[in-house]
Amino acid sequence: MRSLRRVLLQLVLLAGVAFRGVRFDDAADAAAAAQGSSDLFELPSPSPTLALPGGGDEGASTEIIAAPWPGRHGLFTPPRSTSQPARAVVQPAADFGSQLQFYDNGTIQLVDLLSKLPRWQFSTGPPLSKHITTSKPDLNYVIYLDGSETSDLIEVHNGSGVRLPWKLEEFIAETPYIRDSFVTIGSKVSTTFVVNADSGEIIYKHSLPVALNEVGGPLVEEIPSKLDAARSGTSANIIVVVRTDYSISASDLGEHLFNWTRTSFTANYYARYGHQDMLAQSSCLRGNIPCIRTEGPPIKLYLPDSSSDNAIVLRPVNEVSAVDALEPLLPPKKLPQPAGESNVALDSAQNQTADIALGHFVPADTELTNSVTKFSYRWLFPTFLMLLIMACLVKLADASKYCRQFVIRFLKPFMRDEKLMDPRGKSEGTSKRRKARKKDGLINSTQIFSASDKEGNGTGGSTEAQSNKAHDSTNVELPNGLNGRQIGKLCVYSKEIGKGSNGTVVFEGSYGGREVAVKRLLRSHNDIASKEIENLIASDQDPNIVRMYGFEQDNDFVYISLERCRCSLADLIQLHSVPPFSNTKGTDIELWRQDGLPSAQLLKLMRDVVAGIVHLHSLGIIHRDLKPQNVLISKEGPLRAKLSDMGISKRLQEDMTSVSHHGTGFGSSGWQAPEQLRHGRQTRAIDLFSLGCLIFYCITKGKHPFGEYYERDMKIINNQFDLFIVDHIPEAVHLISQLLDPDPEKRPTAVYVMHHPFFWSPELCLSFLRDTSDRIEKTSETDLIDALEGINVEAFGKNWGEKLDAALLADMGRYRKYSFESTRDLLRLIRNKSGHYREFSDDLKELLGSLPEGFVQYFSSRFPKLLIKVYEVMSEHCKDEEAFSKYFLGSSA
């Protein structure tokens, strides 16, 4: 059956080649003869035409065709007759005549080619290109033209770019275009200028779209009188210039991001000779202006030289169909003909088209043919007959298939071997053996799935096992108006909620009555699907990993049903960092405090991410693509961060600490560790590097420690990060600088990060400072005391008494004396005052705040580096002591 279809396809292709070769043979020759390129602009194809019907001979018509001259910028071929097409190629011999030039500032100028002097000029409006960008240094969304010959639109969002499926004009027609919180709008404005080619006077100007108060009114003064003068019988030549401005503007929730304009021109030249009604289009030019141009040659349109007394005959016509405003033409008049011998001259009695010239001409040969006219009669019947035969063969092939199925069903009761019941002629045993030979396929994943359930090891116990075979998908209608597809237990809705790499798309769906997010992957990437399914099963039941409820597959795709979440961490940060939505009253989400520090909610979300990494690393799984877009926020209950998108994750074998140099999957640009960019060995430390970037991203409302997206990878390799923006949070600087260490061996473990002072609660901070004070009060170790006293300059600036309120100084002076230059005395003060907090007066309690939150904030706001500096000293001297081990978990791993 397949061979028969292949033969039919080859017959169709051969018929198409024969059809096209005969039909367009002459057109192809003419196109090859006229092929040329311009270094000024790109001339579109097909070229515009102006049809002039024949006046005396019925059925004959004349057609003027605009097409590029070979090897000439802005020049066009002479017209050809539809009844007797000519193959003449006429080339200019010298630069005589005039030149229409377009400049970047929007000016049009007509220049005499002989004297090189301008004859006239006028402005068409603003400059041809504009590009205005917001002053925001963290612009992470832009749409631009790639500058290639195809002029495709590129959309860049959060460091990743995608080629949009529209051209510029199509994209503007589709606007407004909404992506997340970004709104892009477009406009197209066309302005028409009708200009006297001799004087440069604007006869008429019109722009679309226009304001309502301008509709019906003249856009240029004295337009009616100028139009009357153009029709008064003077031998005026006309140039029609159409300027089209395409503008794109984008904003992010009302805040302007960028806008730019691209301009294109269309110019048409009409010659009026001897009589007011004698008008013909002699040339046409189109050119696209690049969206950003600072300098360069002007765009040119060559006009005919009318200084010659020689003339050729132009046929009379009754109307000009391409220009509605022009009046009927009268009997034939003579146009100026270039000087020289053996030029082409066509008589009006021959019903042929005159060669309306651009510049002077050189001799040319003319050859006429009627092959195009004869085609419709010679090839119409054979083509129809061939199509009829192929349709009959296709129907016959389908009939044979149905007959075969009928025979199999008829003989089914008489068959003893159940293997022969497969209508495809393949036994079930053979199919299973063939499937078992697939490597890294979904079958292996399913077997691993079942094995984990049987072992009862606590991982993946709640996930339902799936069938090895692919299901047939059926379309279903849902009560909420959505359409969907049913694949096994899974229903995939048509509503798309996200996209990923390798053709991955995420849809809304339901699995066994539960709302889920359905991740659809191509079966050609089944190794990615298998890896993600395997690692999701292994990490199931952890609250900080997105749960997988099951998976299904059909002939084309693999569908993974995942826990439905509210949004990604990137979406949450971007939304709440915008002033109208940040810390909005009446909502239960507050990510940053009034002083700009991360709130308890945001600290919990970051701690959830760390907890998820701790769980993966404990199972030997390296995520390898950690970024805000791959961290999801739970939909139900309090905010909780969950790790997702484990398509390129890697599970280490026992006793392994890294992936080889040839490991596949290298994460996302801007979030990869330097060893990933260099394709080196990949250990758990690559997740810690990405975590450092993610923590910085959360604290700074979407900033990145390595700058803008286009420079991040280079700065990561060169270790050029900037933490200045978080300098007011010393604990964050201490942690992030460790996580971004270029040496993976020096990066801390995920367990260490989870217990770092950056994530400590106020109660734990106060407990650590009090335990440290108790420790140094009972010791005579000079090394420890000297180390603590050595941080006084960085911790409080040598005199901590200057930064305390007078009421607190008066209260502490009643009991004992303190040295304002001693770190040990400052820690003693914190320990004593926290222990006697209940004895304070109401005024002093109000000054210090509640215990422990307000109390810790009072001292940390005055001595921001005290906690982290004391932590560094105690980590070096006392981290192995039992009393301090709870503060330094994971630091020695």
UniProtKB/Swiss-Prot annotation:
Looking at the record, the residues that make up the KEN domain are 762-890
- The stretches that face the Lumenal side, renumbered to this chain, are 20-379
* Keyword DNA-binding carried by entry: no
List, in alphabetical order, the Gene Ontology terms for molecular function in this entry: ATP binding; protein serine kinase activity; protein serine/threonine kinase activity; RNA endonuclease activity; unfolded protein binding
Disulfide cysteine pairs (residue numbers): none
- Keyword Transmembrane among UniProt keywords: yes
Give the Cytoplasmic compartment stretches of this protein.
Answer: 398-893
Question: What is this enzyme's catalytic activity, as reactions?
Answer: L-seryl-[protein] + ATP = O-phospho-L-seryl-[protein] + ADP + H(+); L-threonyl-[protein] + ATP = O-phospho-L-threonyl-[protein] + ADP + H(+)
PTM info? Autophosphorylated.
Query: Which sites does the entry annotate for glycosylation?
Result: 105, 158, 259, 351
Q: What is its EC number?
A: 2.7.11.1, 3.1.26.-
Gene Ontology process terms (BP): IRE1-mediated unfolded protein response; mRNA processing; response to endoplasmic reticulum stress; response to unfolded protein; RNA splicing
SUPFAM superfamilies given for it? Protein kinase-like (PK-like)
Catalytic residues, chain numbering:
625 (proton acceptor)
What tissues harbor this protein? Answer: Expressed in roots, nodes, internodes, leaf sheaths, leaf blades, young ears and mature ears.
What domain of life does the native source organism fall in? Eukaryota
> Which family does this protein fall into?
Belongs to the protein kinase superfamily. Ser/Thr protein kinase family.
Chain's role: Involved in endoplasmic reticulum (ER) stress response. Senses unfolded proteins in the lumen of the ER via its N-terminal domain which leads to enzyme auto-activation. The active endoribonuclease domain splices bZIP50 mRNA to generate a new C-terminus, converting it into a potent unfolded-protein response (UPR) transcriptional activator, which then induces transcription of UPR target genes, such as luminal-binding protein (BiP) chaperones.
PANTHER family assigned: IRE1-RELATED (PTHR13954), NON-SPECIFIC SERINE_THREONINE PROTEIN KINASE (PTHR13954:SF6)
Q: What is this protein called?
A: Serine/threonine-protein kinase/endoribonuclease IRE1
The organism is Oryza sativa subsp. japonica
